[in-house]
């Protein structure tokens, strides 16, 4: 896990995910949110080659658990192939904020914290 900004954690996930690994990651992320008092968690799945039904369900449960703790969650790195798989599996991501890449997710997170980034002139 990486602290990107005060109040913003990122969890880059790499490699094949199974239910056990996803569960361990969820528990670690929830504890880290408590430890740091972070308001927003970004789960980046750019490095995940495929998502099956069980993994997608664990991700949704993680988002729900994060919300129950009073924080927001953004899933980034949703590539076209993964998006098609999720739609094909009939999974309901309504209400889950997703972004195509980590940069867009961080931009949204900072906006939600009331921060803006601008280039120095």
Where in this protein do the model-derived segments appear?
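Intrinsically disordered or compositionally simple regulatory linkers and C-terminal tails
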Residues: 111-121
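N-terminal loops that bind phosphate or other acidic moieties
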Residues: 106-110
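A short, well-ordered alpha-helical element
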Residues: 19-39
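Amphipathic alpha-helical interaction surfaces in cytosolic regulatory modules
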Residues: 47-92
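Short acidic-hydrophobic, aromatic-tinged amphipathic segments that line or gate anion-handling sites
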Residues: 95-105
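STAS-typified acidic loop motif
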Residues: 4-26
């Amino acid at each position: 896990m990486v602290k990107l900004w005060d109040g913003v954690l990122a969890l880059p996930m790499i490699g094949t995910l199974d239910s056990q690994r996803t569960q361990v990651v969820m528990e670690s992320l929830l504890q880290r949110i408590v430890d740091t008092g972070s308001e927003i968690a970004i789960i980046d799945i750019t490095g995940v080659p495929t998502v099956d039904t069980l993994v997608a369900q664990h991700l949704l449960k993680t988002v729900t658990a994060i919300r129950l703790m009073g924080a927001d969650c953004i899933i980034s790195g949703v590539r076209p192939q993964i998006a098609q798989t999720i739609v094909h599996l009939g999974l309901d991501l309504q209400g889950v904020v997703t972004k195509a890449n980590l940069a867009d997710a961080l931009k949204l997170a900072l906006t939600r914290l009331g921060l803006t980034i601008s280039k120095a002139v």
